[in-house]
């Protein structure tokens, strides 16, 4: 089987990681993009032109299009086996349009909230190959928040909610955009990583963890994020490894409960159980293969 992954802009390196997971289980998968990623990932999709896609796509058994991209779909729409991934703002803001913009395609997502209105979407969580990094054992627990987009991730409200705990934790919030490897290094120092607090985006339901939640968990952080549709995750993967307070009161109660280091240590152990076996590259490749072969 030969698979071609296509993106115009590969947000969170998602199409590339998807291809790597397929290659890990022996699937011949090539990933290509129109534009290089600005975060400078160590590896990412090969940059190609639209003409190169047009002249080669029929050589593949399946075409996977990422981030609800109608322009790419129009280049390959006569292919008999197309999978479209809906991953973020584009689909969230115009879901009805994008749900119907890809006739005869199969549809997948990594966003739990999309399954509230579209339960037929095939859910695939990200994978990670990162390993736990030992945290400082002395001093205050470090809470970090390093958003890719501070408006989208709810940074202003996160700052306000954490203010009462300034004496109890070493709170580090930084909105500077770093190269991916440098961002991972600062995340790895944190005991607790706050990824997100935003249950709406421009009036539309939001509140679902992203790739950074999986990266931070793999690095050994206790992740606090949102998920307004936990069932979408638990139906496929079982126990969820993130804390997901979806109200201000629940968020602050969560932080208050973690101030005691013994409580924190027990919570990390309980929350991280089974994470690595569910979200490894092999397990994710096998999950992706299921929708390709549908």
Question: Could you tell me what each predicted segment is?
Answer:
Residues 4, 132-153, 159:
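Conserved donor-binding/catalytic core segment of Leloir-type glycosyltransferases
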Residues 13, 262-293:
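A charged, aromatic-enriched C-terminal amphipathic alpha-helix characteristic of glycosyltransferases
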Residues 218, 222-226:
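Short hydrophobic beta-strand element within catalytic cores of glycosyltransferases
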Residues 184, 210-218:
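Short alpha-helical segment that forms part of, or immediately flanks, the ligand-binding pocket
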Residues 196-213, 225-236:
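Nucleotide-sugar-dependent
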Residues 94, 116-140:
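Acidic anion/phosphate-binding donor-loop and adjacent secondary structure
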Residues 33-105, 109, 113:
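Extended catalytic core of nucleotide-activated donor transferases of GT-like folds
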